[in-house]
Swiss-Prot record:
Annotated protein name in UniProt: Proline--tRNA ligase 2
Cited InterPro entries: aa-tRNA-synt_IIb, aa-tRNA-synth_II, aa-tRNA-synth_II/BPL/LPL, Anticodon-bd, Anticodon-bd_dom_sf, Pro-tRNA-ligase_IIa, Pro-tRNA-ligase_IIa_arc-type, Pro-tRNA_ligase_II_C
PANTHER family linked: BIFUNCTIONAL GLUTAMATE_PROLINE--TRNA LIGASE, PROLYL-TRNA SYNTHETASE
GO BP: prolyl-tRNA aminoacylation
Organism: Rhodococcus jostii (strain RHA1)
Lineage: Bacteria, Bacillati, Actinomycetota, Actinomycetes, Mycobacteriales
GO CC aspect terms: aminoacyl-tRNA synthetase multienzyme complex; cytoplasm
């Protein structure tokens, strides 16, 4: 198996092995003692904090408030909505004993919070004046995972989950799309992932939802990653949990509810969208370190070390997250390789000769620029623009890859070929049994009906029945 000098499997040889090696070697994550759990290390958690901060700001700017609800949920709550409990039953972790005694009612460890939040909404809502109720929670959830993969599928993960209640369907559906728009913006503008927003087919909907919307990203192996979802729940949960209000006309009515979430799975998406055989490649807007400075000294050069610290101070003063790697026991070459592995967008190399010339060597993590000698004095003012250009470069690179691996197909042979390396855009009948047959034959599933897709009708690519949805569906193998 091909490996580079860092001991990392090449993406082209085994993408799954590359991913597993990179997230560990780059210091993002470690395995937890319990099967399927992960420890997010400080470098990985800083990435999550940056994503969390930006997402939280957008959630609050649109009128939502953060709250926190219990981790343990009475088992009977899940049974109130039949589709919901059926969808989550295989993944549930249940507490049955406490202090050596059997509980009268088992407690489910939170897989998601529609039920417990629905119970509280019923207490808090009585009038149309109480609506809309716009809540968000940052929490951990547990869904027992038989085939774990760090960040992508783990037994416990971190996320935010929004839950809202509204007077009617129209306002709830607007909320559903607002959340999807937030996720689309975060993925595209911050993570530089050119996701496709769309609606899930009935067979792929969230358990208990009337409609599920998603953003789907293409990873560098051609597979899809569901990166955030938003659900219109109709009155199903309101009926199950008696979430009612008195309307302006004095009638008692059921609320329309929504739920939506984005998780630490996005970290895996960033790794798989931008990484290469050297390791991670972080988009600057979410990089824990946007710039790393490597002073090149032998035996300690006070002038060089001082200049590196001063440059770092000036970069930080203009908002650039900067780290100085002054570890004396490591060679510059080792540091270069390490920071390439860890995905830092820009490396600055500063030695005695550079200091004499008033320059520093700038190396971008990707691109054809190579090493560039740039003036130290003007670098802090120029660096935000350099980082913006790198961010745009990553988005353009990922978009070109996605578009080059997504094919419009009209027959089964082309469909099977397309999903072996990427996505197929095909007409489909919408019949669940046909979806299942496609999955069994190719491992591909309908990822979404793109919101921006052009109107089109015809016959199903598999069974030949009349097409549904009025447009093409994206099919692909997925994480």
């Amino acid at each position: 198996m091909a490996r580079d000098e860092r001991g990392v499997t090449a993406q082209s040889e085994d993408f799954a092995a590359w991913y597993n090696e990179v997230v560990f070697k780059a210091g993002l994550v470690d395995r937890g003692p319990a099967k399927g759990t992960m420890v997010i290390r400080p470098y990985g958690y800083r990435l999550w904090e940056l994503l969390q901060s930006e997402l939280d700001r957008r959630i609050k700017d649109t009128g939502h408030e953060n709250a926190y609800f219990p981790l343990l949920i009475p088992e009977s709550y899940l049974g109130r909505e039949a589709e919901h409990v059926e969808g989550f039953s295989p993944e549930l972790a249940v507490v049955t004993h406490v202090g050596g005694k059997v509980l009268e009612e088992p407690l489910v460890v939170r897989p998601t919070s529609e039920t417990i939040i629905g119970e509280m909404m019923a207490k808090w809502i009585s009038s149309h004046r109480d609506l809309p109720l716009l809540l968000n929670q940052w929490a951990n959830v547990v869904r027992w995972e038989l085939r774990p993969r760090m960040f992508l599928r783990t037994t416990e993960f971190l996320w935010q989950e929004g839950h809202t209640a509204h007077v009617d369907e129209a306002s709830a559906r607007r909320e559903t799309m607002l959340a999807l728009d937030i996720y689309h913006e975060v993925a595209r503008e911050l993570a530089a992932i050119p996701v496709v927003p769309g609606e899930k087919t009935p067979g792929e909907r969230f358990a208990g939802a009337v409609a599920t919307y998603t953003i789907e990203g293409m990873m560098r192996d051609g597979r899809a990653l569901q990166s955030g979802t938003s659900h219109y729940m109709g009155i199903k949960f309101a009926s199950a949990f008696d979430i009612r209000f008195t309307s302006e006309t004095g009638r008692e009515e059921l609320c329309h509810t929504t739920s939506w979430g984005m998780s630490t799975r996005m970290i895996g998406g960033i790794v798989m969208t931008h990484g290469d055989d050297k390791g991670l490649v972080f988009p600057p807007r979410l990089a824990p370190h946007q710039v790393v400075i490597v002073p090149i000294t032998r035996g300690g050069n006070v002038a060089v070390e001082g200049a590196a610290d001063e440059l770092a101070h000036r970069l930080r003063s203009v908002g650039v997250r900067t780290h100085v790697d002054a570890r004396p026991h490591l060679t510059p070459g080792f540091k270069y390789n390490e920071w390439e592995m860890r995905g830092v967008p820009v490396r600055l190399e500063l030695g005695p000769r550079d200091l004499e010339d008033g320059t520093v060597m700038m190396v971008k993590r990707l691109g054809d620029d190579g090493k560039q000698a740039v003036p130290i004095d003007s670098l802090p003012e120029a660096m935000p623009g350099v980082l913006d250009d790198f961010q745009a470069f990553l988005l353009a690179r990922a978009t070109a890859f996605r578009d080059g691996h997504a094919r419009t197909v009209d027959n089964w042979t082309d469909f099977a070929d397309a999903v072996s390396t990427g996505w197929a855009l095909a007409l489909h009948c919408g019949i669940a049994a046909c979806e299942e047959e496609i999955k069994s034959l190719t491992a591909a599933t309908p990822r979404c009906v793109p919101l921006g897709g052009e109107p089109e009708t015809g016959v199903c690519v598999r069974c030949g029945a009349a097409s549904a949805y009025g447009k093409r569906v994206i099919f692909g193998r997925a994480y």
